[in-house]
Amino acid sequence: AALIGPNGVGKSTFLKTALGDLPPLSGEVKIGASVKIGYFAQAHELLNPNNSIIDEITRVKPMLPAEARNFLGSFLFSGDDVFRPIETLSGGERGRVALAKLALSGANLLLLDEPSNHLDIDSQEILQNVLAGFGGTILLVSHDRYLIDALATQIWAASPGKLEVFEGT
C-alpha cells in the first residue's frame, strides 16, 4: 500500500508509530509475532556514518568479502567503492546502501519513508526491481507517482482528520 498526502499530515509519524519509535496518541500498536519489520528511513539515519559500505552490509548478514562485493555490485557499487565510508556518500548512494541492507534483512514487512528521494534514475530502477521482487508486505510513504503506480495495490490518501482507501494497480 502507498500512504500519500500533503506534507505535515503525519505520514512519517504514522510509520514511526508503527515501528514503536513514537507512542500512539491513543490505543496501542500490536505487531504480529511472526512479523519482521524492515525500515527505510527518509534521511538514512539508520546508517553508521563511520562504517564502510561493506561493513554496513556484513553487519546485517555476515558473508565473505567476495560475496559482499558481488552483492553490492547489484546496487551499483564496484571496485574499491565498497570501502568508502558512509559519511562520504551522496544521498542517492546512501539510499542504495539502505536498500541493500533491507534486501538482506529477512523482513516480511517493509515500511518505506520516501525511498525514491535523492535517487538517480539507475538507483530508482534498482529500488523498483527490488521492491517488485519482495515477497512480503510493503507500506510506502511517497510522492513519487511512478513508484506508487508500479507497486501499490492500495492507496491510502491521508488528509487532516481523514484517511481514504483506494484500489491501486
Q: Can you describe what each PLM-predicted range is?
A:
Residues 1-169:
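ABC ATP-binding cassette signature C-motif
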